[in-house]
């Protein structure tokens, strides 16, 4: 009595390996800006992952999802020192849980060309391999901030037909500043130039989009995931969700690796 019966929740942007960040102390002074959080917490964390820790990162997130009625998760994975087969490890854990997931590997230039290409191959391999009714695949990109034009072109050429991308966009001002410095274009303009956008692509965050970027997302049918708890935790700003909805953007809810209690 007094409770709702609802369909299962869908978490449209998560990081299973975020399970290891809970309560983790960051050495030295507290980061003042989001780029420092990446450099002092998230990038050292993902570099520390091996096959065993990848598996154990997924298990508490999946248990938490079951507990809170979240039945489908769209994960964005990175483990630059354990790339090959990493999506299979996550896929096995998802199948054991009985939940559903869409998986991808984060391609980035920040660990060098060899690992960028290894991440590309892992995405393509998993896209072509996945046959499970509980699993699907997309092609992961970190962000415009850590991808050159050459790398974006390689990813666009490599992705099989009918699939889209999963990419962080304008989570912090630094992503927009970097894109303007690289290309004289804002993040969404740059991604559109490389044919990254479209109805099968998910852009995460969009905190610092301008009106033109919102218009492009709406026109291309690209998805936008909103992570309010993460945005508040990282102090990156408040996404203009009402403006996005009025513009006709397809907005969905993610947790960025926080709890799968999607409505809290």
Locate each region found by the language model.
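Di-metal (Zn2+ and/or Mg2+/Mn2+) metal-binding site signature of metallo-dependent hydrolases
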Residues: 3-25
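Alpha-helical scaffold segments that flank or form the walls of functional sites
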Residues: 3-5, 24-76, 81-99, 121-131
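Metal-coordinating catalytic core of metallo-dependent amide/deamination hydrolases
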Residues: 77-207
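Active-site gating loops and adjacent loop-to-helix segments of metal-dependent hydrolytic enzymes
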Residues: 20-54, 111-112, 173-200, 220-223
């Amino acid at each position: 009595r007094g409770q709702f019966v609802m369909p299962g929740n869908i978490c449209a942007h998560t990081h299973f390996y975020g399970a290891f960040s809970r309560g983790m102390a960051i050495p030295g002074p507290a980061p003042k800006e989001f780029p420092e959080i990446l450099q002092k917490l998230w990038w050292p964390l993902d570099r520390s992952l091996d096959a065993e820790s990848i598996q154990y990162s997924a298990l508490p997130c999946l248990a938490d999802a079951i507990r809170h009625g979240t039945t489908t998760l769209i994960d964005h994975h990175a483990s630059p020192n354990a790339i090959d087969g990493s999506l299979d490890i996550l896929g096995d854990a998802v199948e054991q849980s009985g939940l559903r997931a869409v998986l991808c590997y984060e391609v980035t230039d920040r660990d060098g060309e060899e690992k960028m290409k290894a991440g590309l191959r892992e995405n393509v391999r998993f896209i072509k391999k996945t046959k499970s009714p509980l699993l699907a695949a997309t092609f992961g990109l970190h962000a415009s901030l850590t991808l050159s034009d050459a790398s974006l072109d390689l990813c666009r050429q490599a992705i099989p037909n009918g699939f889209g991308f999963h990419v962080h966009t304008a989570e912090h001002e630094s992503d927009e500043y970097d894109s303007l410095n690289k290309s004289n274009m804002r993040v969404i303009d740059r991604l559109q130039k490389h044919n990254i956008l479209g109805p099968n692509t998910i852009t995460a965050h969009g905190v610092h989009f301008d009106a033109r970027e919102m218009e492009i997302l709406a026109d291309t049918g690209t998805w936008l995931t909103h992570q309010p708890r993460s945005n508040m935790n990282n102090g990156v700003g408040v996404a203009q969700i009402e403006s996005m909805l009025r513009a006709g953007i397809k907005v969905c809810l993610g947790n960025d690796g926080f709890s799968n209690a999607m409505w809290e």
